[in-house]
Amino acid sequence: MIQKKKEWEKTKAEGFARATIDNFLDEETCMKLYEECMNAPKGGWTVFTRAGSHMEEFNDLISLPTAHKVTYDIMHSGEFLYELEQMTGISGLLPDPHLVGAGYSILRNGTVLSPHYDFNWNDRLRLHRKLTSLLYITPNWKEEWGGHNVTWTANPELDPTAKIVESVAPLFNRFVISENVPKGPVHGVSKVECPNDVYGRCAIRFFYYISTSEPDKDNPPHRSTYKSNEYSHHKLHEEEHWDGHYVGQGGEDYGYKPKK
């Protein structure tokens, strides 16, 4: 993702940082995510309604093998966090293993997500939300079906002078990521107008956080302390570095290979 660094810096200078990456995963894995989303246990779904919004959500991924592996083997991995830090210039990024507000989402035909800005604090982790990302997973999505992720300069329902900054179509295997800023960015999803035989605008969401805590003055930072603090710490062997592929615990190769 380092090749997206210039796009990130350019959009940050315009008001808020964002990037779009097409063909993010291999198609087979992305299709498995979609099929899994369609067949996820009905009892795990919730519906979010507010100010005209209507969105279905599923965040208990432990029973869904593909989403669980993609989340924890790729999106929450140290390698991927490093790639995010290199692209964004933000250090100390942390994933949310509990997936508060994250996981699968569906907007059905005729629904919208009204203009808003996101929650900024994860009370369970005691961390501030810094990045929001989505991977769109409905195959063969057409731009004329709507469901675009739209960003404005202000909330258009409150400010008639608000202008559209960006409108991104939810095309299959497209990954979008943006930086959360104070009271922004204001965004929403345009009306979904897909055929009735299309399941809906499906995505899987991942959020990333940072800590703003400072060291405890009564217990300042220190290394592991021994009787003697003389030590050595060096590599035992010279070997090839990681090749850039994310491999699951079962040996699955998910095909994502960051470009340097």
What annotation goes with each model-predicted range?
Residues 26, 30, 68, 77-81, ...:
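A structural signal for well-ordered alpha-helical scaffolds and beta->alpha junctions
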Residues 20-21, 47, 94-97, 103, ...:
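A structural signal for short, well-ordered beta-strand segments and their strand-loop junctions
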Residues 52, 137-140:
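Short, flexible beta-strand-to-coil junctions
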Residues 110-111, 118-129, 139-260:
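Catalytic core of Fe(II)/2-oxoglutarate
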Residues 38, 74-128, 140, 144:
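Non-heme Fe(II) oxygenase catalytic core, chiefly the N-lobe of the double-stranded beta-helix
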Residues 132-136:
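Eukaryotic charged/polar low-complexity linker/IDR segments
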Residues 2-88:
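Non-heme Fe(II)/2-oxoglutarate
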Residues 51-55, 101-103, 194:
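Short amphipathic alpha-helical segments embedded in low-complexity Lys/Glu-rich regions
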